[in-house]
């Protein structure tokens, strides 16, 4: 899907800025370079290549090779995949996505989900069926037992589909999550929810909105959080349940990785370095949104602008040094980055695994990687949308730099294709296919010790869904390391999964939990602290006594998790233990930053109370605008509208909003026009490489809520309203309707010069 670039809901000044230092493209000459020699393509061809021809265009480290799992005509326009417990692959296809440069027909309900099977276990799909059709751009899929949960674009409803007669087509549909009082931002389909990642803690996480789900009794139950993830397209987790997001709109390949979003929003300025932000295509990439500032002199993309589809490799068939590495797609650059994940005193950062080189790169200009996964066979799977245009229609308007490149190169004609690859390593043998859906709980328990994270995750998920309590005793033995009927010794990963499975079944007991507090492995102890939150919330007196020694634990992650788990408790025991922790960690960067992030949660909780003197309609409008801003707009504007630096740089993707409404004269009409039709040109004497997209497809109520929030929080309306001046103009949906009608049809964005003359 493109770059999934900009956050919808942004205001005038929400224009992409990046003034990175131009770096000369060079091939690494350092000792130990794992790549064969290759040539840089300065004048690439944009013609269609067959799957076999495309395979010849990839640059890979020695020993690795790509294999075709599925391709057109079996699949078209794939964006996401999911396996059930028996390794049947479901493929979400966005068949109406950017079928021309104007996004004609994009909202037709003609997309689908394919069901693919590898019947002879040779690694290539040989059987397919249309599992579901007549969908609107399906964007989230996840398998639960014999069902597939699906979310489509322009709705937050999640439906379950099931095939009951074995013909490969869904014949039973039911709704597992429905919320009618939610206004979906349908002006730009790039900026809606994605993910549904079943994490180790048995919550399903997604991007954008401050919500996560629990699946139980056949339905999803929402659990609200203080703030959104800041991510955009895709979410993944590692062996310990740490979540990884990326933001194309914020031009940031890694966000919100420091703590679970349930605890608050935390990013550190050096979690992604300036060096990491640079990308190294092996071909010129002139079809960028934003113009020449995003290109080096040799026409290669100079930094991440479309990060998406990230994963942590957790398999067992690729080299061991890949396990735990972070993989993130950049479809504009036609690359996939591999990064080493560093944990220094509890602070996470990433480092390119290669010097000025990418893990996977192609000269096929239609290679558009949008998702990566660890598969049941332990290999790395790559979803290639394989098309000419990757950016959504908001960024391909006539006259733009990108549109000119699209028309000149003929990119619009490359549609209706799609590839799924798997990355394999020489000498590895094909693994046996799983049959998790057919096996009893007693067998599933043994897979918690499997070397492939896919098996561990899906065994845990299946055990929790089945709710079979007959395995509780075995799970407790694994959790405490005393189980002896597994294949090989009980690993710390098996103990972690056993703990979470017990928690998911509602069968965690104190002896098992307290034993885990003293486990030899730091991550098991951290997991136990995380799970102990149920007892902390109950103010169980024994839990605080048992947790106290962990305030001096040698593991930074253990102490940080203890801080996170205790922070919201009002128990005197918790407060005292928290004070002890804080005193001992007063100079620890992670503790200081985490406390600051969690303190902001209080501001979020009390925001409504601070609007208490307003009329109900005004207060509700600002609260709605605040929710939109803090789930979408913060990606570029940053928390509190102070700006969000591009990873590893002092540059901002959009100007700070503090004082922005004043700079525009506080005019409600101008702000409404900007949201309706967009903005381009210079701002305060500075020209940005992108334009603010038109968001007029949203409702009048939605537009007014954003305007009211920005004017209240960042403009001159703020001080007047807070001082009780009720004459400060409030924007109503009727105001928006009137301004919309007065402005009429407008195909081009405004400039500040034009608005000043209005």
Model-derived features with residue positions:
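Beta-propeller domains with acidic blade repeats across secreted/periplasmic ectodomains
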Residues: 22-443, 464-465
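Flexible coil segments in periplasmic/lumen-exposed cytochrome c-class electron-transfer proteins
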Residues: 31-34, 42-45, 607-621, 686-758
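The canonical Cys-X-X-Cys-His
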Residues: 383, 420, 625-639, 692, ...
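Gly/Gly-Pro-rich "capping" loops immediately C-terminal to redox-active cysteine motifs
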Residues: 404, 640-683, 688-700
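Structural detector for internal amphipathic alpha-helices that build alpha-solenoid repeat scaffolds
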Residues: 431-434, 456-467, 490-507, 512-518, ...
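Amphipathic alpha-helical scaffolding segments comprising HEAT/armadillo-like alpha-solenoid repeats
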Residues: 438-445, 468-484, 506-517, 537-551, ...
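Short inter-helical turns and helix N-cap capping residues of alpha-solenoid HEAT/ARM repeat scaffolds
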Residues: 451-452, 483, 490-491, 520-522, ...
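Electrostatic cytochrome c docking/interface patches
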Residues: 605-630, 635, 640-645
């Amino acid at each position: 899907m493109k770059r999934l670039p900009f956050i919808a809901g942004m205001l005038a000044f929400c224009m992409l800025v990046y003034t990175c230092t131009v770096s000369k493209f060079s091939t690494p000459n350092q000792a130990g370079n794992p790549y064969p020699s290759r040539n840089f393509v300065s004048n690439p061809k944009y013609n269609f290549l067959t799957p076999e021809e495309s395979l010849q265009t990839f640059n890979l480290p020695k020993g690795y090779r790509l294999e075709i799992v599925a391709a057109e005509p079996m699949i078209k326009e794939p964006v996401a995949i999911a396996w059930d417990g028996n390794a049947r692959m479901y493929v979400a296809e966005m068949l109406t996505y950017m079928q021309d440069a104007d996004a004609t027909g994009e909202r037709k309900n003609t997309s689908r989900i394919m069901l693919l099977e590898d019947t002879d276990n040779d690694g290539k799909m040989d059987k397919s069926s249309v599992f579901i059709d007549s969908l609107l751009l399906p964007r989230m899929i996840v398998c639960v037992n014999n069902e597939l949960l699906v979310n489509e674009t322009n709705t937050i409803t999640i439906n379950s589909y099931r095939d009951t007669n074995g013909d490969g087509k869904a014949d039973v549909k039911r709704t597992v999550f429905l919320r009618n009082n939610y206004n979906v931002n349908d002006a730009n389909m790039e900026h809606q929810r994605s993910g549904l990642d079943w994490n180790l803690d048995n919550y399903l996480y997604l991007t954008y909105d401050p919500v996560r789900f629990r699946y139980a009794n056949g339905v999803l139950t929402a659990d609200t959080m203080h703030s959104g993830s800041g991510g955009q397209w895709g979410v993944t987790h590692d062996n310990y349940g740490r979540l990884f997001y990326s933001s194309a709109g914020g031009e940031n390949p890694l966000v919100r990785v420091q703590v679970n979003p349930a605890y608050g929003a935390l990013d550190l300025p050096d979690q992604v370095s300036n060096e990491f932000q640079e990308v190294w295509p092996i071909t010129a990439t002139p079809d960028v949104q934003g113009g020449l500032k995003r290109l080096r002199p040799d026409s290669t993309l100079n930094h991440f602008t479309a990060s998406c589809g990230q994963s942590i490799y957790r398999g067992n068939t690729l080299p061991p040094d890949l396990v735990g590495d972070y993989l993130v797609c950049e479809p504009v650059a036609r690359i996939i980055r591999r990064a080493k994940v560093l944990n220094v005193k509890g602070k996470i950062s990433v480092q390119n695994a290669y010097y000025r080189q990418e893990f996977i790169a192609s000269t096929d200009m239609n290679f558009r990687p949008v998702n990566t996964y660890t598969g049941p066979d332990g290999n790395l799977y790559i979803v290639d949308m394989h098309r000419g245009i990757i950016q959504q229609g908001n960024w391909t308007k006539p006259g733009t730099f990108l549109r000119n490149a699209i028309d000149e190169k003929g990119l619009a004609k490359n549609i209706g294709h799609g590839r799924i690859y798997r990355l394999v390593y020489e000498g590895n043998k094909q693994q046996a296919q799983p049959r998790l859906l057919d096996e009893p709980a007693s067998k599933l328990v043994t897979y918690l010790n499997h070397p492939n994270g896919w098996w561990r995750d899906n065994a845990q998920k299946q055990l929790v869904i089945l709710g079979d309590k007959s395995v509780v005793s075995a799970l407790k033995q694994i959790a405490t390391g005393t189980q002896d009927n597994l294949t090989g010794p009980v690993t710390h990963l098996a103990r972690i999964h056993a703990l979470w499975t017990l928690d998911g079944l509602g069968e965690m007991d104190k002896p098992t939990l307290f034993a885990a507090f003293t486990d030899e492995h730091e991550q098991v102890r951290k997991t136990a602290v995380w799970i102990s939150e149920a007892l902390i919330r109950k103010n169980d007196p024994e839990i605080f006594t048992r947790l106290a020694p962990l305030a001096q634990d040698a593991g930074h992650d253990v102490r940080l998790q203890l801080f996170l788990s205790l922070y919201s408790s009002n128990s005197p025991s918790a407060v005292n233990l928290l004070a002890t922790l804080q005193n001992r960690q007063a100079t620890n960067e992670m503790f200081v930053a985490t406390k600051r992030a969690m303190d902001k949660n209080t501001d979020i909780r009390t925001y409504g109370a601070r609007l208490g003197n307003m009329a109900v309609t005004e207060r509700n409008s600002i609260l709605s605008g605040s929710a939109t801003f803090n789930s979408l707009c913060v990606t570029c504007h940053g928390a509190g509208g102070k700006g969000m630096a591009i990873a590893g740089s002092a540059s901002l993707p959009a100007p700070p909003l503090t004082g922005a409404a004043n700079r525009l004269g506080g005019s409600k009409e101008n702000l409404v026009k900007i949201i309706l039709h967009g903005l381009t040109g210079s701002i305060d004497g500075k020209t940005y490489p992108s334009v603010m997209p038109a968001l007029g497809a949203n409702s009048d109520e939605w537009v007014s809520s954003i305007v009211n929030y920005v004017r209240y929080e960042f403009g001159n309306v703020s001080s007047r309203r807070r001082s009780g001046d009720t004459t400060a103009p409030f924007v109503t949906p009727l105001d928006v309707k009137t301004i919309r009608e007065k402005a009429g049809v407008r195909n081009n964005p405004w400039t500040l010069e034009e608005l000043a003359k209005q």
